[in-house]
């Protein structure tokens, strides 16, 4: 769900077995106090805090208030990049690094599957790179949609135009277990059961990117440092 924020509602949803919503509202001060209390744990483990979602930039004002209150904690913004440019760059600069999703390069295809243009996303990616903010590009690989040879090659060409390269390209293969999550919320899962990624196409893209000097990590494979 984290890499598909456009599928999420902005308000709490009940799944089919839920009788009540148990979440609670937090102030920036209260959350900062809680996170800072784990600072020693983060330091020993080499960990930190990742803000994902949904889409964390939808809570940009809250995060802008929260981040300065965190003391010596490594932070990651995991985002679709769909955000007002000025607000996005101000927010991104406050994080240790950014995980930036790139799904589809063709604008018509992007509108078809997400309901929105990708113009602001690609513009934000370019602006992020221009400001030399540390970032990783993550590609959710949806069978026959984002994992096609044409789309992956287009993503490759977009990355080559960036003034500063991503620290890595992270390939996220499709996992059909997501279908069960849709069912719990009474939503129709539109992909056919049993559908799989074309791993030959993905491996060719990975090999080509590595030959061009990119560090590429495929989820499920051992990360090579």
Annotated model-derived regions:
Residues 1-25:
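Canonical Radical SAM [4Fe-4S] cluster-binding loop centered on the CxxxCxxC motif
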Residues 17-21, 111-117, 186-194:
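Short glycine-enriched, charge-decorated loop/helix-capping segments at active-site entrances
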Residues 25, 149, 196-199:
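Electropositive phosphate-/nucleotide-binding environments in soluble metabolic enzymes
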Residues 32, 36-183:
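Conserved AdoMet/S-adenosylmethionine-binding subsite of the radical SAM
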Residues 97-98, 189-194, 217:
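A polyampholytic, Gly/Pro-enriched intrinsically disordered region
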Residues 150, 172, 178-181, 203-225:
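C-terminal accessory regions of radical SAM enzymes
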Residues 167, 183-208:
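A structural motif corresponding to the C-terminal lobe/cap of the Radical SAM core domain
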């Amino acid at each position: 769900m984290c890499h598909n924020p456009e599928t999420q509602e902005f308000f709490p949803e009940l799944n089919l077995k839920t009788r009540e919503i148990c979440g609670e509202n937090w102030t920036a001060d209260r959350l900062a106090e809680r996170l800072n209390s784990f600072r020693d744990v983060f330091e020993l483990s080499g960990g930190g805090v990742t803000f994902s979602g949904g889409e964390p930039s939808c809570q940009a004002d809250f995060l802008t208030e929260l981040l300065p209150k965190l003391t010596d904690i490594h932070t990651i913004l995991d985002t679709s990049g769909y955000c007002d440019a000025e607000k996005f760059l101000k927010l991104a600069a406050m994080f240790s690094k950014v995980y930036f999703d790139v799904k589809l390069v063709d604008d018509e295809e992007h509108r078809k599957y997400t309901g929105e243009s990708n113009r602001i996303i690609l513009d934000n990616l370019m602006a992020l790179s221009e400001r030399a903010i540390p970032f990783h590009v993550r590609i959710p690989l949806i069978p026959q949609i984002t994992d096609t040879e044409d789309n992956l090659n287009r993503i490759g060409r977009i990355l080559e135009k960036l003034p500063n390269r991503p620290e890595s390209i992270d390939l996220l293969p499709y996992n059909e277990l997501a279908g069960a999550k849709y069912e719990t919320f009474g939503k129709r899962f539109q992909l056919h059961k049993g559908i799989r990624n074309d791993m030959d196409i993905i491996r060719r893209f990975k090999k080509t990117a590595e030959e061009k000097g990119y560090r590429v990590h495929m989820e499920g494979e051992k990360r090579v440092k």
